[in-house]
């Protein structure tokens, strides 16, 4: 059995099937390792409220949300890295200036999810906002575009060197967050809090913002469906998200307790 104290998994493209469900088999494996003293955690770009609704019976010990903007351990918030109200307004104004008034924006923080797209209104977790008078701090601002040059101009409205901006591989959006709001920074804060070496963590991921996490942790595992950049830094590659790759790799790592 590997010397692992914590399993961390991304959600979309990793723990989730493509339809955003988690199999009963995977839930049972997670419950088994938790009963045997192994911590299980989620590490996702989603806001906490937008992740919990899909877990259905899974109770993570660790919750890293907003791409690393916030960390919870046993439901206690232990790390927070967000844009101030003024910084959010500067970025939003720059987004409208660079892309025009019809650009689609989303923002999220500890308390909610906000979008100026009315397509989100069918989801009770989203709140419509035109962002013309938005007065809340946020961990993450997302812009519907893959134009890196324009996204860079938006980031430069603050200090581009202090902003992390990455595309999503599966949707035409960019995510902007503070430089320290990354999964690897969040894990470092968690390890400091728990007095735990990252070498005792196994992490699963599939997308750009999982790269730092997989490189930091003792065992970085890419999904078979991961982008090539993630596979290149991973220690191992497991089965795809559709094949319950996370759960099956946990069994291999933690036999006989999984």
Set out the residue ranges of the language-model regions:
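Short active-site oxyanion
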Residues: 37-41, 59-61, 139-141, 199-200, ...
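Residue-level signal for inorganic ion chemistry
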Residues: 33, 67, 141, 214, ...
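Asp-based phosphoryl-transfer active-site loop
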Residues: 3-19
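Active-site phosphate-binding/coordination module
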Residues: 18-120
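Short, structured coil segments at secondary-structure junctions
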Residues: 58-59, 67, 158-161, 216-217, ...
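Conserved acidic, metal-coordinating active-site core of Asp-based
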Residues: 94, 98-216, 225
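Phosphate- and divalent-cation-binding pockets in alpha/beta enzyme and binding domains
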Residues: 25, 50-53, 153, 186, ...
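Asp-based, Mg2+/Mn2+-dependent phosphohydrolase catalytic module
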Residues: 216, 221-258
């Amino acid at each position: 059995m590997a010397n692992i104290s914590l399993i961390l998994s991304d959600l979309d493209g990793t723990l989730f099937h493509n339809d955003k469900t988690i199999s009963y088999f995977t839930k049972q494996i997670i419950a088994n390792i938790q009963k045997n003293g192994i911590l299980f955690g989620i590490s996702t770009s989603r806001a906490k409220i937008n992740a919990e609704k899909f877990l259905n019976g899974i109770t993570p010990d660790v919750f890293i949300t907003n791409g690393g903007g916030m960390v919870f351990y046993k439901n206690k918030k232990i790390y927070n890295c967000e844009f101030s109200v003024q910084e959010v307004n500067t970025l939003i104004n720059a987004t409208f200036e660079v892309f025009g008034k019809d650009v689609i924006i989303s923002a999220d923080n500890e308390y909610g999810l906000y979008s100026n797209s009315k397509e989100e209104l069918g989801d009770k977790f989203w709140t419509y906002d035109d962002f013309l008078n938005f007065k809340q701090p946020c961990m993450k601002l997302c812009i519907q575009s893959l134009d890196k040059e324009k996204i860079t101009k938006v980031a430069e409205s603050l200090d581009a060197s202090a902003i992390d901006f990455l595309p999503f591989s599966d949707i035409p959006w960019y995510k902007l967050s503070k430089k320290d709001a990354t999964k690897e920074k969040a894990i470092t804060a968690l390890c400091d809090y728990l007095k735990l070496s990252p070498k005792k963590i196994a992490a699963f991921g599939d997308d750009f913002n999982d790269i730092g996490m997989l490189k930091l942790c003792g065992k970085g595992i890419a999904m078979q469906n991961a982008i090539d950049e993630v596979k290149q830094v991973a220690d191992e590659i497991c089965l795809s998200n559709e094949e319950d790759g996370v759960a099956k790799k946990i069994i291999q790592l933690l036999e006989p307790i999984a």
